[in-house]
């Protein structure tokens, strides 16, 4: 800590600069979205665990994606709802750092899981005869664990670099949760290294993962076009198109937020883009998979019919 500066012990999240009536409206709307996130992803997890036909590598990774989406929403949305009800209620420094660390961990993990899922589809469609020998359960578990461990370690790097910084005021954080770039703006010390690390992490993880995913799907598209069976081609395209929707939503918003130069987009615009990224993406992911995936639809129908007849 530097000299005679008094370190602040809490932050005040400014959230959304709106009137009380609109705040209550948003509270109800975001609460509804939060319930949809928990129900949607929880349903995906339940269907995969209960139906043995979904005990395949693709759905194994999809279940991990559902867990990440739930965890990511739980790390940000409750605090957002508290801010809407009690705009003047501060968050402690420790709470802010914890929230930032958890969000970064889950965001990095989701980024890596999407790469793993694209690789799984690449092997399934481009090398179908070798799929069972390549994507063994040992390999699947290793890939999933690696995604989680790397996600946590990458977030830990940012946290370790941020904790030594002094925060002497102001304590007003222009965001709806403790986002790393918004927190860095309140530091009284030089944050150049931190900003470089955020950019380096975004370029290496986000851009690297994005291009890896694109390369996988280019190969997949070429393989799909060669499939002679119309039904096989339609099934492969249906599965991959749902994956591409999720990939496009995730990487598109994340790259604009952390890779695009700061002067290209207004700060408020990026704040609302992050709202979409942290609130709407986890809600849309299970909808995309359930609406575009006949296997998930079939499992859901069987479960509902079984419940009616019992």
UniProtKB/Swiss-Prot annotation:
GO terms for biological process: detection of chemical stimulus involved in sensory perception of smell. The keyword Glycoprotein applies. The chain crosses the membrane at residues 25-48, 57-78, 100-119, 139-157, 196-218, 236-258, 272-291. Glycans are attached at residue 4. Its main location: membrane. Residues 1-24, 79-99, 158-195, 259-271 are extracellular. It is found in: Cell membrane. Disulfide bonds join 96-188. InterPro entries: GPCR_Rhodpsn, GPCR_Rhodpsn_7TM, Olfact_rcpt. The keyword Secreted does not apply. Residues 49-56, 120-138, 219-235, 292-310 are cytoplasmic. Keywords: Cell membrane, Disulfide bond, G-protein coupled receptor, Glycoprotein, Membrane, Olfaction, Receptor, Sensory transduction, Transducer, Transmembrane, Transmembrane helix. Pfam families: 7tm_4 (PF13853). One of its GO terms (cellular component) is plasma membrane. SUPFAM superfamilies: Family A G protein-coupled receptor-like. It comes from the Eukaryota. One of its GO terms (molecular function) is G protein-coupled receptor activity. PROSITE patterns: G_PROTEIN_RECEP_F1_1, G_PROTEIN_RECEP_F1_2. It is a multi-pass membrane protein. Belongs to the G-protein coupled receptor 1 family. Odorant receptor. This is Olfactory receptor 2A25. It comes from Homo sapiens (Human).
């Amino acid at each position: 800590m530097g000299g005679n500066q008094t370190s602040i012990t809490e932050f005040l999240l400014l959230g959304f600069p709106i009137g009380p009536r609109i705040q209550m409206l948003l509270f109800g709307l975001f609460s509804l979205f939060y319930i949809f996130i928990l129900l949607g992803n929880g349903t995906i997890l339940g269907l995969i665990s209960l139906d043995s036909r979904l005990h395949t590598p693709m759905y194994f990774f999809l279940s991990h994606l559902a867990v990440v989406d739930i965890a990511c929403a739980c790390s940000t949305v409750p605090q957002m709802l508290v801010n809407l009800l009690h705009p003047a209620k501060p968050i402690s420094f420790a709470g802010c750092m914890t929230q930032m660390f958890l969000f970064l961990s889950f965001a990095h993990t989701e980024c890596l899981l999407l790469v793993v899922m694209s690789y799984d589809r690449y092997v399934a469609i481009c090398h179908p005869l070798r799929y069972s020998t390549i994507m063994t359960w040992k390999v699947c578990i290793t890939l999933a664990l690696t995604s989680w461990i790397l996600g946590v370690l990458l977030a830990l790097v940012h946290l370790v670099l941020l904790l030594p910084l002094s925060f002497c005021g102001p304590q007003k954080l222009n965001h709806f949760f403790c986002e790393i770039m918004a927190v860095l703006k309140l530091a009284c010390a030089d944050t150049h290294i931190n900003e470089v690390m955020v950019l380096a992490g975004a370029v290496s993880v986000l851009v690297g993962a994005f291009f890896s995913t694109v390369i996988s799907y280019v190969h997949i598209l070429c393989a799909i076009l060669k499939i002679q069976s119309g039904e096989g081609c339609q099934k492969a395209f249906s599965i991959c198109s749902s994956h591409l929707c999720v990939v496009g939503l995730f990487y598109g918003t994340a790259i604009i937020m952390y890779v695009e130069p700061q002067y290209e987009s207004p700060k408020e615009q990026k704040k609302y883009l992050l709202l979409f990224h942290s609130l709407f993406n986890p809600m849309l992911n299970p909808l995309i998979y359930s609406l575009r995936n006949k296997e998930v639809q079939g499992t859901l129908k069987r479960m509902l019919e079984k419940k009616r007849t019992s």
